[in-house]
Amino acid sequence: SSGLEDGDNANMSTVYDMALLSSYAINNSLYKKIVGTKDITVKTDLKTYVWHNKNRLLSSYKYCVGGKTGFTERARRTLVTNASKDGVNLTVVTFNDGNDFGDHKDLYEKYFDSLKEYEIVSEGYIDSKYDDSYIDKSFKMSLSKDEFKRIRKEISYYENSASKVVGRVSVSLDGKEYFSEDIYIKDRVKKEEVNLSFWQRLIKRLKELW
């Protein structure tokens, strides 16, 4: 499919579709370099060619890191841009907007002022019922103060797990899960067992088996 709206093989995308795609793509270093390039010069034996990126925000807004302009008959002027400030990464998409560059800048300024990056889960050791429990990944979110208050972090444990994976930690906001990761342990000793003698731990294990 071509991405255009007309013809037998037409397809359509929403601004939300474009925002998801661009937010994912900007994490690719090559893509980010391409869409973030303001100008490029190519010299041949006969002539020198200079191309200028049509995304004017790259030059007029210092936090813009990439994006793509476009035009179709139905959507008219389309613009997808990405911006980053103080760890907060945002994507703005507009269709049929005659003031798209100005609107994008205004939206960035509005949400950069209201959002902050929070580290919800830190990589490494976590507080749980097992000693030496840890996770392999950290998780950060850009949130308003009110959203941060509504974040829910939950830890669940697997019953009688014989592996080093003893549970999961999950993060949700307003009922939607945004992060889930396994909890590992280096030594299968629960915190309450640390001060038990060898025989006390053995008896406890036998009782669990019975």
Range-by-range predicted roles:
Residues 1-7:
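Surface-exposed aromatic
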Residues 9-210:
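Domain-terminus/edge residues, biased toward the C-terminal soluble/receptor-binding domains
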